[in-house]
Amino acid sequence: MSTAEQLFGAEEEEKYVDQDLSEDEEDERFLKAIRSSRSTKPVVDVLKVKSESSADELEERDAHLDRFRRDSTFESETSDHEDFSGGSENELDEETTKNANSIKKISLEEVEKQRKAIKRSGVIYLSRIPPYMAPNKLRQILSQYGKIGRVYLTPESSAKRAQRLRNGGNKRVMYEEGWIEFESKRVAKSVAELLNTNQIGGKKSSWYHDDIWNMKYLPKFKWHHLTEQIAAENAARESRLKVEIEQGRKQLKQYMRNVENAKMIEGIRKKRSERDTLNVSTEFPEETKDLSEDTKPSKQARRFFGQKSIVSNRNMPTDNAKQQKVENVLRRVF
């Protein structure tokens, strides 16, 4: 069987030669043939089947074939680019729409409901937490008086914990202060008035039976005020830490600069002392040889200044005349 028969079949070849098809139909037929034989046979063999057609038809088919090849290469390049970039724009749009749909939408009714719940809530402040009482235990004890929302306890500082462990304390976590949110401000106020300065109670074998509550209701105080306060304290702590680090860095730079200056000054002094000793040895070579190690001159610089005689136009008396005048004065006195 010939190549044309393998591509199109013998019957299709006869029909194609006899019938007068339009250009669009010819293009579609060629595209189908090329797509079916693209993986097994080269496209150039298709032209051998059309030997009976005219030269004009062959030229038109060649043009269509070139156009199809260009289109196919462009499609393959775009598909590769889409695979490399992670998908086409349509796929990205679908992903974004899915993510948008997955986000839970809050209606105005829910927003209003949350606002009212926040307005109804009340917060109690505990200035002292019983030793080793965890937030879950605190919630369990106070939940019998009313519905509790959120609980926050401040753990002890690392310095206090380290000191406590050095003194033989327990390794369990201790808390210093805390805040408890009740869903009803009335319940929170009544609980604070009822339990303040009273024993925790419960079973006598309980760890916290003899401890005393120390709590206070905070009027017009909401949970977001607490979060804002904690955020402000953390920001202030970070700023102080940055300032201390910067100050320590400056002190270290100044210390290193002083060390370098001290080394430089020490080197200058050493060179000067060596130079002065050389000058002394050159000025008094005999004396330095005779001196012992204990009586050697010090390394300090010695300078000698020669006194010049007084120059004057007056006739200054000699030493003998001065002595004679002194004797005459003494004779008159005594």
Swiss-Prot record:
Keywords noted in UniProt: Nucleus, Phosphoprotein, Ribosome biogenesis, RNA-binding, rRNA processing
CDD domains: RRM_ABT1_like
Protein purpose: Involved in the small subunit (SSU) processome assembly and function, and in the 18S rRNA synthesis. Required for the early cleavages at sites A0, A1 and A2.
Residue numbers bearing the Phosphoserine modification: S22, S51, S53, S54, S85, S88
GO biological process: endonucleolytic cleavage in 5'-ETS of tricistronic rRNA transcript (SSU-rRNA, 5.8S rRNA, LSU-rRNA); endonucleolytic cleavage in ITS1 to separate SSU-rRNA from 5.8S rRNA and LSU-rRNA from tricistronic rRNA transcript (SSU-rRNA, 5.8S rRNA, LSU-rRNA); endonucleolytic cleavage to generate mature 5'-end of SSU-rRNA from (SSU-rRNA, 5.8S rRNA, LSU-rRNA); small-subunit processome assembly
The name this protein goes by in its record: Pre-rRNA-processing protein esf2
Location in the cell: Nucleus, Nucleolus
InterPro entries: ABT1/Esf2, ABT1/ESF2_RRM, Nucleotide-bd_a/b_plait_sf, RBD_domain_sf, RRM_dom
Organism: Schizosaccharomyces pombe (strain 972 / ATCC 24843) (Fission yeast)
Gene3D superfamilies reported for this sequence: 3.30.70.330
UniProt superkingdom: Eukaryota
Basic and acidic residues: bias regions: 61-84, 286-297
Region (Disordered): 1-25, 52-98, 275-299
Family according to the record: Belongs to the ESF2/ABP1 family.
Biased amino acid composition, Acidic residues: 10-25
Entry GO MF terms: RNA binding
CC per GO annotation: nucleolus; nucleus
Main location: nucleus
Domain RRM: 122-212
Glycosyltransferase keyword on record: no
